[in-house]
């Protein structure tokens, strides 16, 4: 029965849909918005000093919702200054959505957008193969994308080397205190692994940055994901959330019954979720890691 399970990443359409359901059922973007409102202005306070243009690199920009939040904060900090925003994103579908979002968003006049349909590894390879030195950036952000990188230390070292003076990297990924950390550690070996994705949290990232000798600050914010529908048999929304939780395509239909029963039981335990007003809210806490350029 276990052999019937396959990685969610083997079906791009279902992955995108399950990710959309995750966003609709979680406070992920609200949590990010809170960080952008309260913390980001201080973080970007010096990135554009005495510059005619601010260069921003979005690695794994997705459909652009969070990117545009970031850009609005940069615009507010540096009114009238031109912004060059380059996006590295492997999904053609997400790039189309990103472009549609830009087209219907006002106050984008001083921002130049360019998109590259490639992974961060492909971007890195392309930059290293070009004869000229790779461009330097004033702000690089990597939002919920390090799970899809094979060599995280090498990736961090490469992008850290692209920072201009006073520049920063913002990395967002799940916290080491989240339910994801516990779920992956307990069940990862029993779920279909894909070399496209690896289990990594802020705890792992902090260790990697320490080993590289790179300075950083880490902020944790509370986020939840409503997984109540996962406990309703045959619920379409619940089935897609199951897929996202386990990174397994059609998990509800293909997983061994004992595995699903075990995970279902655990997901209701306090170390994974809280129960509130009849809902089961999975711990989706996020970490925001700010990496500084070398002085």
From Swiss-Prot:
GO CC term (a single one): cytosol
Entry's localization field: Cytoplasm
Disulfide bonds: none
Listed CDD domains: AdoMet_MTases
DNA damage found in the keyword field: no
Reaction it catalyzes: histamine + S-adenosyl-L-methionine = N(tau)-methylhistamine + S-adenosyl-L-homocysteine + H(+)
PROSITE patterns (UniProt xref): SAM_HNMT
Enzyme Commission numbers on file: 2.1.1.8
A Pfam family recorded for this sequence: Methyltransf_23
Top enzyme class: transferase
Entries under Gene3D superfamilies matching the protein: Vaccinia Virus protein VP39
Single GO term (MF): histamine N-methyltransferase activity
UniProt: S-adenosyl-L-methionine binding residues: 60, 89, 94, 120, 143
Residues that coordinate or bind substrate: 28, 284
Keywords for the protein's UniProt record, in alphabetical order: Cytoplasm, Methyltransferase, S-adenosyl-L-methionine, Transferase
GO biological process: histamine catabolic process; hyperosmotic response; methylation; response to amine; response to cocaine; response to glucocorticoid; response to immobilization stress; response to interleukin-1
InterPro entries, sorted: HHMT-like, SAM-dependent_MTases_sf
Main location as per UniProt: cytoplasm
Function: Inactivates histamine by N-methylation. Plays an important role in degrading histamine and in regulating the airway response to histamine.
Family named by the database record: Belongs to the class I-like SAM-binding methyltransferase superfamily. HNMT family.
Subunit structure: Monomer.
Protein name (database record): Histamine N-methyltransferase
Taxonomic lineage from the root: Eukaryota, Metazoa, Chordata, Craniata, Vertebrata
